[in-house]
Amino acid sequence: MLREFSFYDVPPAHVPPVSEPLEIACYSLSRDRELLLDDSKLSYYYPPPLFSDLNTGFPNRFHPPKSDPDPISIVKDVLMTKGIQMNSSFLTWRGLITKIMCAPLDPRNHWETYLVMDPTSGIIMMEERTRSETSYANQDRMCYWGYKFEAISTLPEIWDACSRDQIEQRDNQDVVPDEQYCSIVKINIGKSKLILAGEVDCIWDKKPCSAKESDVHSDDGTIEEDASNAENPNLHYVELKTSKKYPLENYGMRKKLLKYWAQSFLLGIGRIIIGFRDDNGILIEMKELFTHQIPKMLRPYFKPNDWTPNRLLVVLEHALEWIKQTVKQHPPSTEFTLSYTGGSKLVLRQII
C-alpha cells in the first residue's frame, strides 16, 4: 500500500483552530540516559558574555549525543507511570510534527518516520528509528557551537541560588547534549488531538506550579486543565538557537525563523533567544524574540507564493487528517513509514 499527500493539492482555507499547548507531564534524562520522572535537569537562562568563543572545549570537553533517536515508548511509559491517561489521535515527538509542518520549506530535504496504531488505545504512535540529517562540511564543529551556546547560556538553578563560580565558569564545563529536560504537552490542531514531547533548553525565570498530574485526567480518560490551581509553565520556557545573521529580506533567514517559530509554537514555548555568531564561531549579538511575534515580524517580507505560518498550519491540519484516515483503514498494529524525499509530497507506505 502506498499513498501520497501533495502540499499543493491542499485548497486555500482558514487557519485551523489550535489550542494552547498545555504541559501534562515532564521528565529528565541524565548524561547516562537514565530516565528521571522529575524536572531535575531543567536549566535556567542566564545571558552569556558577548564575544564568547563557541569553539572553546571542542573536542576535548564535548560528549557527543547518542546516535539513535529515543523511542516514543519512553513518553508512553512516563505517562503511564504518572497515571495520566491518553486521549489523543497521535503520540509523538514535537520534532517530527515540526518536520511535517515545515516540509514545504525544504524541497531538497529527506526524512523518514515510522507509524503504528496502538491496538489498546487507538493512538497513532510516530517515531524516528534512525537520524535522517543531511551532512555538510564542518558539521561536527558547527553542531558543537549550538550545544556550546546552550551550555554558556544556562545555569543548573535560578541565578540567585548559584554561586559566582557556577556563573563565571560556564565556559569551562563539559558539553553534554544527552542531559535533557523534556516537556510533554497536549495540543489540538483542527480535529486532531496530539500529545507531543520535546526537549526544553531552559526556563526564563522560575517554573510555576503546574497542575497536579492527579488533577489532569478525568473519569472518562480525557486530560483536563485545572485552571484554578495551575499555571501552564510552557510560556516561561526558552528555546536557544545559534545562527549567522542575515537581513529579513534574505529568504534563508526567513525560512530559518519560520522553523524556529514552528518548533516553539508546537510546544508552547514563549521565547526564542538567538545567539548570532560569525563564521569563526564567535558570539557577536543576542536577540530575544517572543514566539508569537515572529509571524507578524515576517509578514511584510512575504511574497505572494511564500509559505507563511498560516499556510503551513493549514497543510499540517490536512496532513494529520490524511494520516489518521489512511492508518484507520488498516488493522491496529499495522506498521507504516511516512517519508519525505523532497519535492511536494509526503508518502505513506505500509510495511509488509
UniProtKB/Swiss-Prot annotation:
EC number(s) reported in the record = 3.6.1.-
Q: What class of enzyme is it?
A: hydrolase
Return the cofactor note field: Divalent metal cation.
What are the subcellular locations of this protein? Nucleus
Q: Name one GO cellular component term.
A: cytosol
Source domain of life = Eukaryota
Where are the Phosphoserine residues found in this chain? 218
Pfam families of this UniProt entry? RAI1 (PF08652)
Keywords of the record, alphabetical order, are: Hydrolase, Metal-binding, mRNA processing, Nuclease, Nucleotide-binding, Nucleus, Phosphoprotein, RNA-binding
Q: Does the keyword Nuclease apply?
A: yes
The UniProt entry's coiled-coil ranges are none
Which residues make up the binding site for a divalent metal cation? 150, 201, 239-240
Outcome after substituting residue 159 to A: Disruption of interaction with dhp1/Rat1
Instruction: Give the record's subunit note.
Output: Interacts with dhp1/Rat1; the interaction is direct, stabilizes dhp1 protein structure and stimulates its exoribonuclease activity. The interaction also stimulates din1 pyrophosphohydrolase activity, probably by recruiting it to mRNA substrates.
In terms of PANTHER family, this protein maps to:
DECAPPING AND EXORIBONUCLEASE PROTEIN, DOM-3 RELATED
Instruction: State the family it belongs to.
Output: Belongs to the DXO/Dom3Z family.
Outline what the protein does.
Decapping enzyme for NAD-capped RNAs: specifically hydrolyzes the nicotinamide adenine dinucleotide (NAD) cap from a subset of RNAs by removing the entire NAD moiety from the 5'-end of an NAD-capped RNA. The NAD-cap is present at the 5'-end of some RNAs and snoRNAs. In contrast to the canonical 5'-end N7 methylguanosine (m7G) cap, the NAD cap promotes mRNA decay. Also acts as a non-canonical decapping enzyme that removes the entire cap structure of m7G capped or incompletely capped RNAs and mediates their subsequent degradation.
Could you tell me what this protein is called? Decapping nuclease din1
Q: Which organism is it from?
A: Schizosaccharomyces pombe (strain 972 / ATCC 24843) (Fission yeast)
